[in-house]
Design a protein with these regions (language model features):
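Conserved N-terminal beta-strand of ABC nucleotide-binding domains
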Residues: 10-12, 23-25, 151
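Conserved ABC transporter NBD signature motif
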Residues: 60-68
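Helix-to-loop junction immediately C-terminal to a conserved catalytic motif
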Residues: 52
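ABC ATPase nucleotide-binding domains
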Residues: 76-80, 84-231
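The feature captures the beta-strand-to-loop junction immediately N-terminal to the Walker
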Residues: 37-39
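ABC ATPase nucleotide-binding domain helices that frame the ATP-binding cleft
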Residues: 45-48, 144
């Protein structure tokens, strides 16, 4: 799996007069899992969509593997995204969902079937290839969505609040699965959540956002033990208030 550093250089995103991301500079180190954490409306999902190419920055630069991708369309960025809603095709089997992206780039059938089966094994869904999404639990559907993203071997893997539709017990299990897969593949991963426990449990680095800017960034232990301001202290955990 390819590894790539992602850099924001003075990224600003405005929607009319509303500033969603305000002059943000940060880096997402190659091969690590970085979480963008913050309350609703803080700019974390907009930042993720800018990396994916689903939104264009108003100003600033995005670098992926030292390549300026600021104006590149999403299809040319070598980035895969796992959405909150899973976004599986209901009329396709599991293996048809997983192999869809490979078919779109004209990989031959024998190769895309083989790669898809290997990827399903990686996400612990071996033997599920002929099932339909409606026959799967929420956690299994999420794993299919992860498999569909990683089968393309992207430079960067993006997650937009992937566990918000799951119950608490399943959330814990699936987040552990995501972290295990990320470490096994070594793919640069950027993960958006508003759940502090989730962020602290799986991340190499956490970037806390508030009001369109970065409130603090660092490893989970440092953020928890040494919050820089009251907002971070309150948001990360009651123990620091």
């Amino acid at each position: 799996m390819k590894k790539a550093e992602v850099k924001f250089e003075n990224i600003t995103k405005k929607f009319n007069e509303t500033v969603a991301v305000d002059n943000v500079s940060c880096s997402f180190e190659a091969g690590t899992l970085t979480t963008l954490l913050g309350p609703s409306g803080c700019g974390k999902t907009t930042s993720l969509r800018i990396i994916a190419g689903l939104e264009r920055a108003t100003s600033g630069k995005i670098l992926v593997d030292n390549e300026d991708v600021t104006i590149l369309p999403a299809t040319d960025r070598d980035v895969s995204m796992v959405f909150q809603s899973y976004a599986l095709f209901p009329h396709m089997s599991v293996i048809e969902n997983v192999s869809y992206g490979l078919k779109m780039i004209n990989v031959n059938k024998e190769e895309y079937i083989q790669k898809s089966l290997e990827t399903l094994k990686l996400v612990n869904l071996e033997g599920y290839e002929n099932r339909m999404p409606s026959e799967l639990s929420g956690g299994q559907q999420q794993r299919v969505a992860v498999a569909r993203a990683i089968v393309l071997e992207p430079k960067v893997l993006l997650f937009d609040e992937p566990l918000s539709n799951l119950d608490a017990k399943l959330r814990r299990q699936v987040r552990e699965d995501i972290r295990e897969i990320q470490q096994k593949l070594g793919v640069t991963t950027i993960y958006v959540t508003h759940d502090q426990e989730e962020a602290l449990a799986i991340s190499d680095k956490v970037i806390v956002m508030n009001n369109a800017v970065i409130a603090q960034e660092g490893n989970p232990k440092d953020l928890y033990n040494f919050p820089k301001n009251k907002f971070v202290a309150n948001f990360i955990g009651d123990a620091n208030v």
